[in-house]
A protein has these predicted regions:
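Conserved AMP-binding/adenylate-forming
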Residues: 11, 68-173
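Alpha-helical "lid/cap" subdomains adjacent to substrate-binding clefts that gate access
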Residues: 8-88
């Protein structure tokens, strides 16, 4: 069926499909002429500045951008969401690495795309971003789902400090 008829609240998507959604949105904006396209691009820049990395949305002096973001949401971004049925609260991205820029775009238009991480042989989901203040950071796979424990080990099984590459080892109850 047509996504506008179904009016979903949540969308599960692989990054490649989300990229196509973005291309279609941008093509639709482009068709409306250079003035609309410039306004849309400016609105994105303002929303990007306000949202920053998602985790620090509206912090510091950026709170002053909130009225402008709300205006652009009402006159532009709401129409983008209507193209998806108007009810989408968030996307869940999985199956491949989700580009932070793609997350930034969908967050700006009011359809946050949440990244998760999982292994079918371990458990379907190991970590995930979620909605809420300070719970969503672009380019991150979020917090570890409880009661799981994650460690990064070197090739000899020694635990590695944060930021050092190694093998991901997961333990659950």
């Amino acid at each position: 069926g047509n996504i506008r008829e179904v009016k979903p609240h949540v969308l599960l998507s692989v990054p490649a499909l989300a990229k196509n959604f973005r291309k279609n949105i941008e093509a639709s904006i482009h068709k409306q002429g250079p003035k609309v396209e410039k306004l849309f691009n400016f609105a994105l820049k303002v929303a990007y500045a306000y949202n920053r990395d998602g985790y620090t949305k509206g912090k510091g002096l950026r709170f002053m951008l909130k009225p402008l973001v709300a205006l652009f949401d009402k006159i532009l971004f709401k129409k983008v969401r209507e193209g998806f049925g108007g009810n989408i609260k968030f996307f869940v991205g999985g199956g491949a690495l989700l580009d932070a820029e793609l997350q930034r775009f969908f967050y700006a238009v009011g359809m946050p795309m949440l990244q998760g991480y999982g292994l079918s042989e371990a458990t379907p989901i190991i970590s995930a971003n979620s909605l809420g203040k300070g719970r969503h950071r672009f380019g991150s796979s979020g917090k570890v789902i409880q009661p799981l424990e994650i460690k990064i080990l070197d090739h000899e099984g020694r635990e590695m400090p944060t930021g050092v590459k190694g093998e991901i080892v997961i333990k659950g109850e």
